[in-house]
Amino acid sequence: KMLGVVAKKPMSDYE
């Protein structure tokens, strides 16, 4: 999910 980029969260959120 690209949510990590928008929410500025760690890359772990990508999985």
Curated annotation (Swiss-Prot):
The keyword Membrane applies. Signal peptide: none annotated. It is a single-pass membrane protein. It comes from the Eukaryota. GO terms for cellular component: mitochondrial inner membrane. Keywords: Membrane, Mitochondrion, Mitochondrion inner membrane. One of its GO terms (biological process) is oxidative phosphorylation. The keyword Chaperone does not apply. Pathway: Energy metabolism; oxidative phosphorylation. It is found in: Mitochondrion inner membrane. Belongs to the cytochrome c oxidase subunit 6c family. Component of the cytochrome c oxidase, the last enzyme in the mitochondrial electron transport chain which drives oxidative phosphorylation. The respiratory chain contains 3 multisubunit complexes succinate dehydrogenase (complex II, CII), ubiquinol-cytochrome c oxidoreductase (cytochrome b-c1 complex, complex III, CIII) and cytochrome c oxidase (complex IV, CIV), that cooperate to transfer electrons derived from NADH and succinate to molecular oxygen, creating an electrochemical gradient over the inner membrane that drives transmembrane transport and the ATP synthase. Component of the cytochrome c oxidase (complex IV, CIV), a multisubunit enzyme composed of 14 subunits. The complex is composed of a catalytic core of 3 subunits MT-CO1, MT-CO2 and MT-CO3, encoded in the mitochondrial DNA, and 11 supernumerary subunits COX4I, COX5A, COX5B, COX6A, COX6B, COX6C, COX7A, COX7B, COX7C, COX8 and NDUFA4, which are encoded in the nuclear genome. This is Cytochrome c oxidase subunit 6C-2. It comes from Thunnus obesus (Bigeye tuna).
